[in-house]
Every structure is written in C-alpha cells, then in structure tokens.
C-alpha cells in the first residue's frame, strides 16, 4: 500500500497509512509532553472537582499544577483504602471519580495480604486500547513482513470475583481480554493470533494452555512471533509442551481433540480447525522425544523472528533459559503498564533486554516523579538523565498523586518525553511470576513456620535468607535456614520441615497463593537446612569483599552466584511443601 508522504514520521518509514498516523500521534504527544500533561491534569481536576476526595482538600475548583501539588498529598494505597472499601461495599456517590467506577482491577501488589483494588472507569478501556494500537506500528519499523503470518501468544484469563457491592474485581488483562475491545477486535493483518478467543477466554488454565499450544503446533509455519505477557509464562508453555507432546501428536495424527478438553466452546471451535495430519504428528514426535531441547522454538516454529515477552525487572532472571530454548532470538519488551495505569511503550523494541527503555506517553495520566531519597516530586519533563525516581500518578479514575511503587531510571528523552529503564518494584524481595513478596511478609512467614518448629521439637530458626530459584519450571522460593536446636532437643524430622514449608506458604499473600493454586506459575516452596556456622561464613565472605563488620546485616534475599553456591555447599537437607496452600478468589473482609 502506498503511504501518504504527509503522514511520514521521524521514527522511520511506516509500513502503511494506519501506521503512519500512529507514529505521528506518538511524535505529537512526545513533542508537546508538558502541554499535554498540563491540559490533562486540568481536565481530570475539572471533571472530578465535586468528588468527595478533592473537596476534602479544599481545591475549590482549581485546575493548575501549583495549587494541586500544594493542597493534594502524595499517598499510598493504605491512605486510600477506606474510600476504596466504601466503593467496593456499594457506595455509588462520587467519592474518587465523577464517572461511575465500573470495576476494580486487582493489582499484583498486596495490602494486608490481599490484592490491592484499583478503581477504574469504562473509558479507561479506550485509553488502554489506544496504547495497544501504537505497539505494532513501532514494531513494524524494525521487523518487516509481520502481516504475512501470525503471532503465537499464550494469553489467559484469571479468576475474578465481585465485591460486596457487586463490582467485578479482576486482573487488568482479564478485564481487557473479556472486553468487546478484544473479543470483537477488527481484523488486522499485523495482529493475527494462532490462539482462538475461545481458548484464551477459557477459565480452566489446563484446557486453555492445551488448546493454545495445539493451535500453535497446527499453524507452526505461519508463526512469526512467539510471546506471553511475562517471560515466566512463555517458559511454562515450553514446559507444558515437554510434558504433553505425545498427546498433541496423538490429537494431530487422528484429528481428534483430547477427551480432557471438555469446554464446549473450545470443542466446537476446534472441530473446524483440527484435521488428521500424520506428517505433522511424526514431526512433533521426532523433535520432542529428544532430551536436547536447545533451540526448540526455532526447530518447531522455524519462521519465528522474535519473542514478545517482558524480560525487565524480576523477569530478567529468565533471559538465559529463553535464549537456550529460542537459540538466541531477540526479545521484545513492547510496553510498560500496571493495574493503576498504562504508562508508555518501547520505541526501540529490538534493543537488548538490559537496554530496554520505555517512553512515557503523556496522554495516559498525569505523571510525577519523586527522586530516590528525596521527597519533592518533579514534573515529567523535568527529570534528569541518570537519576532514579519513584513513579506517582493521577488518573481519570480518581487516583490522585498515588505512589505506584516502581523505581525507574531516566535513560534519555524522545522529543520532550523522558525514557525510563525499569529498575525494580519498591520493597519487593522475591518474585517468580506476578507474585511479589516483601521483607515484612517473608519475615512473618518465617516466624509462623518457626513456631511450628518450636511446637513440634523445641527448635527455632536462628537465621535465614531466601532465593528465587528459576532453574526449575515453574520457579519456586527457596529458604535457607540455620536452626537453633537446644541441648537435649530432638532434630526436626523431614515431616516437620515439610509442614514448615506449607506453613510459610499459608502465611504468604493471596497473589502468591493464587500463583501456586490456580495459575501453576510458582512451584512448591523449598526449605534448605544449612549446617551451623553457615551464616557466619556468609558474613566473613561479605566482609572480605569490603562490607563493614559494624554495619553488616544478613541479606534476606540473595542472587549473587558465589553466595548461592556457598549456601548450597552447606546444605544438609532439603524439604518441599507437601501440598497446595489454601486459596479462593474471595477476598477476606477487613
């Protein structure tokens, strides 16, 4: 298709006229970032002027930035929790937003062990869809020909519930996949998936994964990109193929869907897709029966050009494994988003994972940034390259000066919009998938498990640290325990220590427990008991590397390979959680 030269973009030559318009929109927003931000805040404040929250701080209809920042405090979820609970309980008065709260998006972050509830309004779907619509126009600048094939993406809906007041409470991606924006999306040759909607929307994770993988195998030569939301999700899909390849080959050979797939909509959908193909079945058997799974992605899907997965932050730990399975394919991190707000996109999606930077789109929300170690928030356009900041957002849905908890480092600017490298989540100690465990949660879990130990054999945990082990699929938490066994007390049995593992899991937050029970994205927690004196050796090692003996504290999480190796060399026994912890979609009442 010929592209109107008036629609060209400084980002590069667009693939089509639709792309050209999207790229020009990015240019317009980023060139005028400060004006866009000023106008956006004024619009939010004018719209929500009569809400209970803004009236509480006597804003009196003011819409300028100075008055806003003088009168409205920077807050955390706990500050807003009473208002959110009232909305959840059914209060429909304009508490936070002049527009009705349509649902709650459940964050992977937690408060008092439960997922945080982020209020949202219907029009936010349009805003999120707008950001999605910018991703492929940017990708097409770097990878040509994506309209000639399909994407094999492993996408899933998760458990949802309703609040006491009847509002849905569900993860942001579940909300999006169930929306008309996704289910009735118009045909776009640059955005065709191998997975049918029926498989993506199936609430049974096994049936959904099975069907999506089967469709990807049937369409293997059409696949040009392979992806999931997180790197860990793509690795679970590969592990699923390792476990079930013989069943896939059987289905493909006979053209019959496995009897364990009982979802009626899936069975009806697959009846028009699955036909006998003995040649493909034999190919799958030949490739998958080998113990060598190196480059398995490009062996089965030979036309794959890149992986579309998040490999920044905690997901960076999966990069070596993905490189092994893909043969070193590029990994594209395309966008930066959360339950609170969608933030921006990667304008150089083929960059190395360690160099990924996201450009903040100033039309998504009003953004402020608190310098690390500081207190005064600065504007979007006033951040400094090389500095680290905590992200603060004000949204149309009623979050005002809300601390998201993400730590970002400024790497540069695109026009006047800053570009950020995601550094970490504030206070997060352990993470395998969407789970996030902080130090206080881990400490509480260890204390509860230590009580089990004391009750059963009189022992206690003398010292501990932890490690997110991603060498297994799925990954799992490892706790290194040094025990204090009193004179005359018996050594704890294997059964006691496995109960300690389960006791810890029961003490962790609901996102962790959902990951274990419903999503199968985290494996059983492991306790590795180390011999006495190990943590003194750990301190000696740290001091030998320059740590101050007066200021040394035992790290509650380790990831430096020599330290992990030191701990593993001192392990005297290992124990795993014997069963799944308790979890239901229902939220605990506070």
Swiss-Prot record:
InterPro entries: GH3, GH3_C, GH3_M. Keywords: Ligase. One of its GO terms (biological process) is response to auxin. Its EC number is 6.3.2.-. PANTHER family: GH3 DOMAIN-CONTAINING PROTEIN (PTHR31901), INDOLE-3-ACETIC ACID-AMIDO SYNTHETASE GH3.1-RELATED (PTHR31901:SF96). Belongs to the IAA-amido conjugating enzyme family. Catalyzes the synthesis of indole-3-acetic acid (IAA)-amino acid conjugates, providing a mechanism for the plant to cope with the presence of excess auxin. This is Probable indole-3-acetic acid-amido synthetase GH3.1. The lineage of its organism: Eukaryota, Viridiplantae, Streptophyta, Embryophyta, Tracheophyta. The gene is GH3.1.
């Amino acid at each position: 298709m010929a592209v109107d030269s008036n629609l060209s973009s400084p980002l590069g030559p667009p693939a089509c006229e639709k792309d050209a318009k999207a790229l020009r929109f990015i240019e317009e927003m980023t060139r005028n970032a400060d004006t866009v931000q000023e106008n956006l805040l004024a619009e939010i404040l004018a719209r929500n002027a009569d809400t209970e929250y803004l009236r509480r701080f006597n804003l009196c209809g003011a819409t300028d930035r100075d008055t806003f920042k003088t009168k409205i405090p920077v807050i955390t979820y706990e500050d807003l929790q009473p208002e959110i609970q009232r909305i959840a309980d059914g209060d429909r008065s304009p508490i936070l937003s002049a527009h009705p709260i349509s649902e709650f998006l459940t964050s992977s972050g937690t408060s008092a062990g439960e997922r945080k509830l982020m209020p949202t309004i219907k029009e936010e779907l349009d805003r999120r869809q707008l950001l999605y619509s910018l991703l492929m126009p940017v990708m097409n600048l770097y990878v040509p020909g994506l309209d000639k094939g399909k994407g094999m993406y492993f996408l899933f809906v998760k458990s949802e519930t309703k609040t006491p007041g009847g509002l849905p409470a569900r993860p942001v991606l579940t909300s999006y996949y169930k929306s008309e924006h996704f289910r009735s999306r118009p045909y776009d040759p640059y955005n065709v998936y191998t997975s049918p909607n029926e498989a993506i929307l199936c609430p049974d994770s096994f049936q959904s994964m099975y069907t999506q993988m089967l469709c990807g195998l049937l369409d293997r030569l059409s696949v040009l990109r392979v992806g999931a939301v997180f790197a860990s999700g793509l690795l679970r899909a590969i592990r699923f193929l390792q476990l079930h390849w013989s069943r896939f080959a059987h289905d493909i050979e006979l053209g019959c869907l496995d009897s364990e797939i009982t979802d009626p909509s899936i069975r009806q959908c697959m009846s028009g897709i699955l036909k006998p193909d003995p040649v493909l079945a034999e190919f799958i058997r030949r490739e998958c029966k080998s113990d060598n799974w190196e480059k398995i992605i490009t062996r089965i899907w030979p036309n794959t050009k890149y992986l579309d997965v998040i490999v920044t932050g905690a997901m960076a730990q999966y990069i070596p494994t993905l490189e092994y399975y893909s043969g070193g394919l590029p990994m594209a991190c395309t966008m930066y988003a959360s339950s609170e707000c969608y933030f921006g996109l990667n304008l150089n999606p083929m960059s190395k994972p360690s160099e990924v930077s996201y450009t903040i789109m100033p039309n998504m929300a009003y953004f402020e940034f608190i310098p690390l170690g500081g207190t005064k928030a600065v504007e979007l356009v006033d951040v400094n390259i090389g500095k680290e900041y905590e992200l603060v957002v004000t949204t149309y849905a009623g979050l005002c000066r809300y601390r998201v908890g993400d730590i970002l480092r400024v790497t540069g600017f695109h026009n006047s919009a800053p570009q950020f490298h995601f550094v970490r989540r504030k206070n997060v100690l352990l993470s395998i998938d969407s789970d996030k465990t902080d130090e206080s949660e881990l400490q509480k879990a260890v204390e509860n498990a230590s009580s089990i130990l004391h009750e059963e054999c009189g022992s206690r945990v003398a010292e501990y640290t932890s490690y997110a082990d991603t060498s297994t699929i799925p990954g799992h938490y490892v706790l290194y325990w040094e025990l204090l066994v009193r004179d005359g007390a018996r050594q704890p049995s294997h059964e006691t220590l496995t109960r300690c593992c389960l006791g810890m899991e029961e003490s962790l937050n609901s996102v962790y427990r959902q990951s274990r029970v419903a999503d199968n994205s985290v494996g059983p927690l492991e306790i590795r008991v180390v011999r006495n004196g190990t943590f003194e050796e750990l301190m000696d090692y740290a001091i030998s590397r320059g740590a101050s003996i007066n200021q040394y504290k035992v790290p509650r999480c380790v990831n430096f390979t020599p330290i992990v190796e030191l701990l593993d060399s001192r392990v005297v026994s290992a124990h795993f959680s014997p069963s799944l912890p308790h979890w239901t979609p229902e939220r605990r009442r506070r």
